[in-house]
From Swiss-Prot:
Basic residues composition-biased segments: 15-30
Keywords per UniProt: ATP-binding, Chloroplast, Nucleotide-binding, Phosphoprotein, Plastid, Transit peptide
The protein, known as: Universal stress protein PHOS32
Name of the coding gene: PHOS32
Signal peptide limits: none
UniProt source species: Arabidopsis thaliana
Record's subcellular location: Plastid, Chloroplast
Something else known: Can bind nickel.
């Protein structure tokens, strides 16, 4: 599928950055850090910039739809933020692909190239953006690469100046139970306690929860009380900002 098709955003709205991994304090900004304000973007001039962190999963798709239905308001702009790991190729459809597979099994199918994975990632994130496009919300797609997904996500959220960030998860710690380091779960837990802006975690409803999603809201930050008012139909868990 071509991300440039009419059902997807134009390619200039999709940027995959390959910057060196920042190993510095959240309060230190390097002059070499690329600026999202260098050129006009679809989010310029928005009253609020709402981030939705996505990992190409069904949970992320649900989080985007929830944000459209319950959180995003006229005048807002949305940034779909994806951090792609550098050490392992990971995709919702491909699954984790350790680099040692071909060494262990010479008969294994050739692994996708980095270019293939970049194209796959851009297409999948563009698919996630469809609800935003359908309702006319301005948005852009921001993709970066780093081996430390949790820290990089928090750094990008701060650098982009987001008013709030929404992400999907089946529950904190779900990632650890599955033994994967690529999906939101403990990532969302880390963001709840380290991001500089309010964080809303929408847990994909399962058989235990019933049809109503569980929404976890990080306390702190000034976000006009939007979370409580907008998602009154969902069960809430509140976490104090440490």
């Amino acid at each position: 599928m071509n991300p440039a098709d009419s059902d997807h955003p134009q390619l200039p709205n999709i940027k995959i950055h390959h910057p060196p991994s920042p190993r510095h304090s959240h309060h230190h900004h390097s002059s070499s850090t690329p600026s999202s304000a260098a050129t006009p973007t679809p989010t310029a001039g928005a009253r609020r910039k709402i981030g939705v962190a996505v990992d190409l999963s069904e949970e992320s798709s649900f989080a985007v739809r929830w944000a459209v239905d319950h959180y995003i308001r006229p005048g807002d702009a949305v940034v779909l933020l994806h951090v792609s790991p550098t050490s392992v190729l990971f995709g919702a459809d491909w699954g984790p692909l350790p680099l040692k597979t071909q060494i262990e099994d010479p008969n294994a199918q050739p692994q996708p190239s980095q270019e293939d994975f970049d194209a796959f990632t851009s297409t999948k994130v563009a698919d996630l953006a469809k609800p935003l496009k359908e309702l006319g919300f301005p948005y852009k797609i921001h993709i970066v690469k780093d081996h430390d997904m949790r820290e990089r996500l928090c750094l990008e959220i701060e650098r982009l100046g987001l008013s709030a960030v929404i992400m999907g998860s089946r529950g904190f710690g779900a990632e650890k139970k599955r033994g994967s380091d690529g999906k939101l779960g403990s990532v969302s837990d880390y963001c709840v306690h380290h991001c500089v802006c309010p964080v809303v975690v929408v847990r994909y409803p399962d058989d235990r929860d019933g049809p109503v999603p569980i929404v976890t809201v990080k306390s702190g930050g000034d976000d006009d009380g939007d979370v409580v008012a907008a998602s009154a139909s969902a069960h809430h868990e509140h976490i104090k900002d440490e």
